[in-house]
Amino acid sequence: MVTGIGMDIVEVLRVAKAVMQDNFVMRVFTPAETAYCRSKGKQAAQSFAARFAGKEAVLKAFGTGLRGGKLTEIEILNDNLGCPQVSLTGYFAAYARQKGVKNIWLSLTHTKEYAAAQRVMEAEK
């Protein structure tokens, strides 16, 4: 049963400027996300922006906003096929368990100028 849908779009340039500040990167991204995005070279800003949009989409699907948790408790990394996978820790992991969340489906996309994410949260009936 679908229990939440979230979607977000961000400007890559805006995120590119923000990730120039280490404080922003440490507050928003996990070390693994940061390493992944920086490994993308010229497309690093697009990768950061897509993950930022993904985190926002997760928050919207939960319907909670950032209350009680931190963005670093939502980690988005790709599996060996390149599909984005969401891992939750801390507050958001506990919230997902409480809501009976079984699957989190996430789609990320980006162009030179924009990054977007859509997320569907599925729980047991």
Predicted regions and their residues:
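Core catalytic alpha/beta fold that binds nucleotide/phospho-ligands
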Residues: M1-K125
